[in-house]
A protein has these predicted regions:
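A residue-level marker of the well-folded mature domains of exported/periplasmic proteins
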Residues: 2-5, 23-190
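C-terminal motif of bacterial Sec signal peptides marking the signal peptidase cleavage site
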Residues: 18-22
Length: 190
């Protein structure tokens, strides 16, 4: 029975993430939705903790709204936390979500290398964990949803090569070093 619950939890979270990423086909999403809703009466509401690094980037506000709306339609509740760019605050909020006994913890990390310990605490508490967009390093999360960041870097490099005359200089401004995606985009760019 417990394994069935985890499958339903992952189905709900995965469905919400696929909806955000625009990767799921309509019929797949509807099947997952129906399966998740059928399981709700048997096992109670799924509780999802969703920890954002900040809402400075407009995308995160949009992702939050779509994620929460999709989860509610699937019968899950979402506790949204915003760390406002503070690693210390995000760790505190993740500990809060662990104490609230969420079933799944979805994290957009402020610092990809600073959350390892608190994510291990979540796993020890039996909470399924997911890195959303930014891989939390050495945390052994159950799921990682993101873009092909190396591919993004390669596409950027090709576009610049086609747009700039031979021998032209390129000055590249990147994101924060705490974001593992920066490293991956750079690898693809080179």
């Amino acid at each position: 029975m417990r394994m069935k619950k985890w499958k339903k939890i992952f189905a709900a979270v995965l469905c919400a993430c696929l909806f955000l990423a625009g990767c799921g086909r309509k019929e797949e999403t509807e099947n997952i939705s129906r399966e998740t809703q059928e399981s709700q009466s048997d096992e109670g509401e799924i509780k999802i903790g969703l920890s954002f690094d900040s809402f400075v980037i407009e995308r995160w506000i949009r992702d939050r709204d779509v994620f929460v709306d999709t989860a509610k339609k699937l019968g899950a509740s979402v506790n949204v936390q915003n760390a406002n760019g503070s690693v210390k605050e995000q760790i505190s909020q993740i500990e809060y979500l662990i104490d609230r006994d969420v079933d799944v913890l979805v994290v957009i990390a402020v610092d990809c290398g600073a959350l390892t310990e608190v994510m291990h605490k979540a796993k020890e508490a039996g909470i399924k964990t997911m890195s959303y967009d930014r891989l939390i390093l050495n945390a052994d999360t159950d799921l990682y949803v993101s873009y092909n960041n190396k591919g993004v870097g390669t596409l950027m490099a090709k576009a610049l090569k086609n747009a700039i005359p031979d021998g032209g200089d390129i000055f590249m401004i990147q994101g924060a070093e705490e974001d593992n995606n920066v490293k991956l985009v750079r690898e693809g760019f080179e």
